[in-house]
Regions:
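Structural preference for solvent-exposed beta-strand-turn elements
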Residues: 1-181
Length: 181
């Protein structure tokens, strides 16, 4: 009441914080989704963590400051590059069978989503031409997409690799530790 919010905790005490009238806050924009699907929190966390390191900080090339999300029949790909590093990860079985779509989601928006995901969440992701939304049981984040064409990364990834090596992970990790000292 009167623009204040009362917060209480178990045995901690009560706190009154200044707040605003909820009616004064703008409505979240509608996302006229071309693609809607759900994915487990652990899967989207894994995908973002495997690609976000390659996102560029160079504001002169805005398309590289986000992660390319490609939705295809039954799979979602995330791709990031800064011009020197490239990361691509594919998650199959997202339960989507519509038209393919490519969008570039800002890194800041994905960081917010990752920070607020609970382990048991299964966010619904809705992708449109200019916006994306990430909705869980308790929250909804809507972001503008980065406008532009992502570089054709497929040409730098070899189709076939004639060389192949099999080794135990423990042996590789041991060798890396010895070299890094």
């Amino acid at each position: 009441e009167d623009g204040k919010v009362l917060l209480g905790g178990e045995g901690v005490g009560n706190y009154i914080l200044p707040g605003g009238d909820p009616v004064e806050f703008p409505e979240l924009p509608a996302v006229d989704a071309k693609v809607t699907f759900t994915i487990k929190a652990e899967d989207i966390r894994r995908m973002v963590s495997k690609t976000i390191f390659a996102v560029s900080n160079d504001e002169m090339r805005p398309v590289l400051t986000g992660i390319l999300i490609q939705v295809r029949s039954e799979e979602m790909r995330m791709v990031a590059t800064d011009g020197h590093r490239l990361s691509k990860i594919i998650h199959r079985t997202i339960g989507y069978s519509g038209e393919p779509i490519d969008v570039i989601v800002p890194m800041k928006a994905l960081n917010l989503v990752m920070r607020n995901l609970q382990d048991d969440d299964e966010p619904e992701i809705a992708l449109a031409e200019s916006r994306a939304s990430f909705t869980t049981k308790s929250q909804r984040l809507v972001t503008r997409l980065i406008d532009g064409h992502y570089p054709r990364y497929e040409s730098v990834i070899p189709e076939a690799n004639p060389g192949r090596m099999n080794l135990r992970t423990s042996d590789l990790m041991s060798a890396v530790r010895r070299v890094s000292i």
